[in-house]
Amino acid sequence: MQFQVQGHSTYCYTGGRPFDPQKPTALFIHGVLNDHSVWILQSRYLAHHGWNVLAVDLPGHGRSAGEPPASVEQAADFLAELMQAAGLAEAALIGHSWGSLIALEAASRLKDRISHAALVGTAFPMRVSAALLDAAQNEPLKAIAMINQFSRSTLAPPPSVLGPGTWVDGASIALNKRILAGNRQFNLLHRGFVACDRYDRGLAAIEELTCPLLFVLGQVDQMTPLKAAQGLIEQARARGQSVQVVSVPVGHHEMAEAPEATLAALRGFLST
């Protein structure tokens, strides 16, 4: 499904179902050097079980045109305009990694227009090492190899991931390379990492939220370790917000490495 947002064409995957304005909407946001496809299993399920799904390609990524966001705040502005273009009075936001920060920032701004915010593989601050930032800028293919080495806890997928024999590590590397090559004007890897590294409004955003929160965290995540989300969790609980925390025994790609557990967490959360 295509929308015109900020003067450019924006692609959203709908899970193979037509958009129904009578249903609630879940808006999925991917991370650095990814696209809508990282949510394929969870988004398609929700689309066939009572939800509208908009799994967006952020500007400059995948099938979406426009300049890629240089900050979390810019991406949150884009989400607000996407909701306006789609005619959404309300939506649930579900974000992974960089996308989780975008979801958090957007929810803090849009307040009652956001019914739920699910943060998958999140951290605050989401620091990126100097070595990885340098590799992302000067040797992006080397950086992609580094990312995937630290992101994954499994080489073979569970049975529910797209079928037996799926190579989750290789598929992730191929996606990263395709998204990188798809935008010759901007280095999407370095730009996204800088946006993560510089975002400083995590705790302030928690203070401004009005919706319930879900954290889905990988127990062996080396990119955004469990402990790196604790500040957000504690801040939200101290404010008396509704907070659910689900940990799964995988790394940074919860959606592919633990698809059923991640979906179960989302289903339970969205039903509240």
Regions found by a protein language model. Name each.
Residues 223, 250-263:
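Catalytic histidine-centered segment of alpha/beta-hydrolase-like enzymes
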Residues 1-26, 48-51, 88-89, 234, ...:
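Alpha/beta-hydrolase fold catalytic core
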